[in-house]
Swiss-Prot record:
Its EC number is 3.6.1.9. It is found in: Cytoplasm. The record marks 13, 82, 164 as: Important for substrate specificity. This is dTTP/UTP pyrophosphatase. It comes from Cupriavidus metallidurans (strain ATCC 43123 / DSM 2839 / NBRC 102507 / CH34). Pfam families: Maf (PF02545).
Length: 200
């Protein structure tokens, strides 16, 4: 049993959720020379489910190499990746405000899926889980989209929204994992961590 975990994520939401579980962790962030964004490139014809799981596993591989380079103790590493999809279209992080507005307009009045993959990597191998949730947005008026985008909240978030923030007013219904939609499904994460021998 171990009580140390490395979290390879810059997301403040994932940190909050991991703390909510009562897990003690240390951050294992990318080095300046690592191109973390390159890991998130979508392959032609790749399904959203395959995409999010592949990216999460690649993040785990990169974090294992980082841990070895830094000579850190052999403790489990947690990575996660979230994507929003409408049909087969992957809606990643918006490039800019205009892109964010277009994404939100495409989600207005529809039901979309939020996929969050989780990987726990140890020297013995990797364990994976996938959380799939359905989120229904009410119709969102153009001025509402404009105000929300102007707040800056959509930037840096898959699908151009954070469910725990101002976008909560757009959410008519959720079917699935609220914490998964935020970026770290706690049920699946806790199970993977315990399987990896983490004590919390």
């Amino acid at each position: 049993m171990t009580s140390i975990l490395y979290l390879a994520s810059q997301s403040p939401r994932r940190r909050e959720l991991l703390t909510q579980l009562g897990v003690t962790y240390e951050l294992l962030l990318a080095d300046a020379g690592e191109d973390a964004e390159a890991l998130e490139a979508v392959r032609p014809g790749e399904s959203p489910d395959d995409y999010v799981q592949r990216v999460c596993a690649l993040k785990a591989d990169a974090a294992l190499q980082r841990r070895a380079r830094r000579g850190l103790p052999d403790a489990p590493i947690l990575t996660s990746d979230t994507t929003v999809c409408r049909g087969g279209d992957i809606l990643g992080k918006p490039a800019d405000a205009r892109d964010a507005a277009a994404m939100l307009a495409s989600l207005s009045g529809t039901t979309h899926r939020v996929l969050t993959a989780v990987t726990v990597a140890t020297s013995a191998g990797q364990r994976h889980a996938l959380s799939i949730s359905h989120v229904t947005f009410r119709p969102i008026l153009a001025p509402e989209i404009e105000r929300y985008v102007a707040s800056g909240e959509p930037l840096g978030k898959a699908g151009a929204y954070g469910i725990q923030g101002r976008a909560a007013e757009f959410v008519e219904r959720i079917d699935g994992s609220y914490s998964g939609i935020m970026g770290l499904p706690l049920f699946e994460t806790a199970a993977l961590l315990r399987e990896a021998g983490l004590h919390f």
